[in-house]
Amino acid sequence: MMSAPKITFIGAGSTIFVKNILGDVFHREALKTAHIALMDIDPTRLEESHIVVRKLMDSAGASGKITCHTQQKEALEDADFVVVAFQIGGYEPCTVTDFEVCKRHGLEQTIADTLGPGGIMRALRTIPHLWQICEDMTEVCPDATMLNYVNPMAMNTWAMYARYPHIKQVGLCHSVQGTAEELARDLNIDPATLRYRCAGINHMAFYLELERKTADGSYVNLYPELLAAYEAGQAPKPNIHGNTRCQNIVRYEMFKKLGYFVTESSEHFAEYTPWFIKPGREDLIERYKVPLDEYPKRCVEQLANWHKELEEYKKASRIDIKPSREYASTIMNAIWTGEPSVIYGNVRNDGLIDNLPQGCCVEVACLVDANGIQPTKVGTLPSHLAALMQTNINVQTLLTEAILTENRDRVYHAAMMDPHTAAVLGIDEIYALVDDLIAAHGDWLPGWLHR
């Protein structure tokens, strides 16, 4: 290793995300002199990120260098860490297409980035480019560690380790640590007092144990307190981001039924199951406060907010931000210095969870040190949680097989097995929907889908 790492960002035009990750990086002593290589295909967005990153670096007293690239392989050369954060096809046209075509066929969605027709199409658009990153890494930085933040996380991660098993990679999300903080806030307790053990699949992991530290140093189960707060109307608290559309009722109701709390948000979870979004059942939407079309609304708001923020950053002499809850800088620091840390990552199920399929993508606690990312064994999940996860893994299995073998039929089979889609549409209607999505996305999808 050199004295300072090289950190390459693929999709550096995702300026808000880059800002959060590098804000953390620049405050770690071992990473302050890192070479930051920013790469994006959009020169304007790339330059915007460059402005923000330079001010972040200077404000934090970091002294590394920044290079900007529109060519991926050039940016990756000799990298130690590769952070991937992009959206193939963007909000427009592709996300809009996913929502509008599905709606024409009678299928409502909330986020559409993980499962269902929206998640399936996003995977088909995204995986070929992730594979190209793996190809380039194999050639110019074979020992680098990839930190992948791109959804649909499980399918993307699975497709990469299936085709490029030699690439060191982990899929990262902030739902485990983020929800833990959220639950602490709901109960008015310090998040630092929490202790938990969590496992499952991306966006559907559960806190198998959730405890808080008491005054005498012992730990007590937090679940009875959490349930009592919900039933008394004291939890959940209003959305911390001020988003009144997202009220977090779905997860608390699932907690009442299952006995365990899930990591991903209510707006996500509502579309991973067959129970909350049904034609003609406005009563369910109202009762559970399901925010239909949430992701497109969020995209419009974020774009507007970003333009405002960017103007402020351009005028500011310095940029100081609070530490984020993202794992990226923790992982880099642990690998670079050997100082051990524990994170939650999405990895191949090599005997980690006994009652989920071997080889599927699971989210578990991982030890990180100079040896890299080392997933920890969970054992057997409660059977009802594993059964629920399996309904989502079915879709992931078939879609991953579809793209690995270029089997168009498996794309339809994946959509057929989606719990929400199957609860709303008949078989022929599902096939017609997939036909229309493939046609509408055109060249954003791999050529074999159009043969």
From Swiss-Prot:
It comes from Escherichia coli (strain K12). The gene is melA. Binds 1 NAD(+) per subunit. NAD(+) binds at residues 5-71. Keywords: Carbohydrate metabolism, Glycosidase, Hydrolase, Manganese, Metal-binding, NAD. Pfam families: Glyco_hydro_4, Glyco_hydro_4C. GO terms for molecular function: alpha-galactosidase activity; manganese ion binding; NAD+ binding; oxidoreductase activity, acting on the CH-OH group of donors, NAD or NADP as acceptor. This is Alpha-galactosidase. Mn(2+) binds at residues 173, 203. The active site is at residue 174. Homodimer. GO terms for biological process: melibiose catabolic process. Its EC number is 3.2.1.22.
